[in-house]
Amino acid sequence: MNGEEEFFDAVTGFDSDNSSGEFSEANQKVTGMIDLDTSKNNRIGKTGERPSQENGIQKHRTSLPAPMFSRSDFSVWTILKKCVGLELSKITMPIAFNEPLSFLQRITEYMEHVYLIHRASCQPQPLERMQSVAAFAVSAVASQWERTGKPFNPLLGETYELIREDLGFRFISEQVSHHPPISAFHSEGLNHDFLFHGSIYPKLKFWGKSVEAEPRGTITLELLKHNEAYTWTNPTCCVHNVIIGKLWIEQYGTVEILNHRTGHKCVLHFKPCGLFGKELHKVEGHIQDKNKKKLFMIYGKWTECLWGIDPVSYESFKKQERRGDHLRKAKLDEDSGKADSDVADDVPVAQETVQVIPGSKLLWRINTRPPNSAQMYNFTSFTVSLNELETGMEKTLPPTDCRLRPDIRGMENGNMDLASQEKERLEEKQREARRERAKEEAEWQTRWFYPGNNPYTGTPDWLYAGDYFERNFSDCPDIY
C-alpha cells in the first residue's frame, strides 16, 4: 500500500487530522439570533430554502438545523496515545469531534471582518492602512476562539464559493493537493478595491495533552487603488486538554506583515498563555517604517479587540505597569515543576477586558456571537450561514462545492449515522479514483488554481487561474 492509499479522509465514524476605529461594525453584522426550534424553517434557512429579503439585502439563516452532537461519550485517548510528537495527517478521529464545515469553509471565515479591508483601501496614509490591515490579520483568527471541533478535510478537487454583496466581496477556494493537503483561495472586492489570496497547508501535531496546528502558507492582500501588497503568515493554534479536562484554545507566535511597496512592517506577537494565564489571548506589536523606526504600537486580545497608540505613550504606560508588577510579584506555582502527566491543564482565567491606555485608538472589536452559539459548535453568525443551500443554488454551483457534500450535510442536520456512512463512501470513492489515476499514470489536474511562486515573496504558492465566475463547470470531477 503506497502513501496515498494509507491516507484516510472518510472512514466510518472517523476522520483524519491533516487536518472600532472611525468605522462602525454594527452594519457589518449578520442579522438575527439563534433559534433552536427547528420547526421554524423560514428562520433557520434549511437546505433548499431561499432566505428572505430585508430592504433589498438578503437575510441569511441564523441557526443550524440541529444542535451539535455530544462528545462526552467519546475518548480521544485511545486513538492518540501512540501518536505523541507525530504529524496527524494519517491519524483517524471520531466524527463526533468534527464540526459541520469543510476546511475550505473554515478558511472563508477570514472574510467575516472584511470591512477592515474596505477601510484600509479608503485611508490615504500608509501608516493608517497598515493599522487596518493588522486589525484584519488579527480578526481573521478570532473565529477560532472556543472552536474545538475539527473541520472536515476537503476532498481533492473540492471547492467552495461565497458571494456576499452586502459585505462587498466574492470568494473561491479549491483543494488543490492531497499529499500534502493544500487549500488555495482567492477573494476580490466587488468594487475592485482589493484582492486577497493564498494557499494553506495546515500541519498538525499531537504533544501529549494538546494538538498544535501550524498554518503554513503565505497570505497576500492587495489594495489595488494604492498599488500595495501585504503578505503574512498566520500564528500557530493550539488546542489543550484533548485527552481529559475542558478544551481550550490559544494562539501564539510572531506574525510579520510587510507592505512590499513602502517597506512598512507590522510585527505582532501572539503571546503564549504563560504562568497563571496572565498573557492568555494577548497580542502586542508595533508598526515600523522601512528604516525600522517604530511609528505605532498595537495591543489587545485576538478574542476581543485591538487598540493602538503612539510609542511614547505606550512605553510610559508599560514602565508604570512593570513597577506595579514588581510590587505585586507572586510566588511561583508549587506545581509548576511537576512532570507532565494525564492531569488536565487548568483553563487559564483571563482578564475580562483589555486595559486601555488613555489616548488609544480602537482598531477592531470582535462581533458578538449568537446567544446559543455553544450549542452550534461555537459558530459566529457569519459562520452559521456558510453551509446554507438556497433554492436554485444547485443549478449555479459546481458539483464540487462543499454545500453539496452529503457527509457534512448529514452532520449539520444531526444525522451522525448518515454522516459516517457518507464519509466512508466518499473516502472509498476517492481512493478508487486515485487507483485509477495510478493505473493510467495520469496526474490530477486542478481546475481553478495552478502552482507557481508568490509574486511578492517568491515562495511557492497556488495562484488563481481566473474564469471561475464564468460558470463553465462542464469539466468538473464527480467527487461526491
UniProtKB/Swiss-Prot annotation:
Residue list for modification Phosphoserine: S19, S20
InterPro entries tied to this protein: OSBP_sf (IPR037239), Oxysterol-bd (IPR000648), Oxysterol-bd_CS (IPR018494)
Phenotype when changing K423A: Loss of increased cholesterol and decreased phosphatidylinositide accumulation at the cell membrane
Cellular localisation: Cytoplasm, Cytosol; Lipid droplet; Cell membrane
Effect of I79A: No effect on phosphatidylinositide binding, but impaired tetramerization and decreased cholesterol binding, plus decreased cholesterol and phosphatidylinositide transport
Xref: Gene3D superfamilies: 2.40.160.120, 3.30.70.3490
Effect of K150A: Reduces 25-hydroxycholesterol binding
Region annotation (Disordered) ranges: 1-60
GO terms assigned for molecular function: cholesterol binding; cholesterol transfer activity; phosphatidylinositol transfer activity; phosphatidylinositol-4,5-bisphosphate binding; sterol transfer activity
Biased composition (Polar residues): 15-30
Residues that bind a 1,2-diacyl-sn-glycero-3-phospho-(1D-myo-inositol-4,5-bisphosphate): K90, H178, H179, E427, E428, K429, Q430, R431
Biological processes annotated in GO: bile acid biosynthetic process; cholesterol transport; intracellular cholesterol transport; phospholipid transport; plasma membrane organization; protein homotetramerization; regulation of presynaptic cytosolic calcium ion concentration; regulation of synaptic vesicle priming
Expressed in which tissues: Widely expressed.
Phenotype upon changing F152D: Does not significantly impair 25-hydroxycholesterol binding
Impact upon substituting M93K: Mildly decreased 25-hydroxycholesterol binding
Entry membrane topology: Peripheral membrane protein
One cellular component term from this protein's GO annotations in UniProt: presynaptic active zone cytoplasmic component
Function statement: Intracellular transport protein that binds sterols and phospholipids and mediates lipid transport between intracellular compartments. Increases plasma membrane cholesterol levels and decreases phosphatidylinositol-4,5-bisphosphate levels in the cell membrane. Binds phosphoinositides, such as phosphatidylinositol-4,5-bisphosphate. Exhibits strong binding to phosphatidic acid and weak binding to phosphatidylinositol 3-phosphate. Binds cholesterol, dehydroergosterol, 22(R)-hydroxycholesterol and 25-hydroxycholesterol (in vitro).
Assigned protein family: Belongs to the OSBP family.
PANTHER family, alphabetized: OXYSTEROL-BINDING PROTEIN-RELATED (PTHR10972), OXYSTEROL-BINDING PROTEIN-RELATED PROTEIN 2 (PTHR10972:SF153)
Oligomer and partners: Monomer. Homotetramer; phosphatidylinositol-4,5-bisphosphate binding promotes formation of stable tetramers. Interacts with DIAPH1.
Protein name: Oxysterol-binding protein-related protein 2
